[in-house]
Amino acid sequence: MGEEKIIEVKKLSVGYAGRVILRNVSFDVRRGEIFIILGGSGSGKSTLLKNMIGLYPAMGGEVLIRGENMIGAAGAVRERLLRQFGVMYQGGALFGSMTLAENIALPLEECTRLPREARVLLSRLKLQQVGLEPFADYLPSETSGGMVKRAAVARAMALDPGILFLDEPSAGLDPITSAELDELIRALSRDYGITFVIASHELASVYAIGDRAILLEGGGIAAEGKPVQLRDDPPNDYVRAFFRREPEKARAA
């Protein structure tokens, strides 16, 4: 993990229907780290993540990815930015009528001119990287929840981006399966130098893999730092209360 700032969020504000969700949020993500957007239900963590990838409009501010602003990007600039990251949506969001291999090949079909044989080969390679190559021809319904999440990570990696955004990757998984997914994320970060930005409230997972985190509250950042340090040495009463309350939810997940 280096000190290079691969993502810079500057004074980002987001709102809907007259209600401000995020106000003047600023932080940076360093190359190769696993960065956690942490917060309770309704804190805006998924909104922040989706805004960073250009799905939601912003009221103001910037999201710089390798120095280029995602907010308001259009045309060739937007296309170039979109190729720099992959996304795993909450629940995995695989197409149920497609096999795992076909799901992974879809971005290759839409975004490259590779022949079918090359797309098939690459999709199976990505499945191999997440431990699912033997299940390439299975439908999502024929696999487990943990396998669906792994396949969704593989699809996010299809175009070899340097950054992966994951929205609640451990949601709905039992503790053992969640720990296995954590091990995969850590291995991908270590072996391929991928930078991860993860929205999560699952503290067991956050402690296991998070290099740094921000804790959202009231539309802003209540704290920033290493997850274990925030837990053990909370900078304010809200952070202390959050980490006392949330572990019970994490163990019950």
Regions found by a protein language model. Name each.
Residues 139-143, 147:
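Conserved ABC ATPase signature
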Residues 164-167:
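Catalytic Walker B motif of ABC-type/P-loop ATPase nucleotide-binding domains
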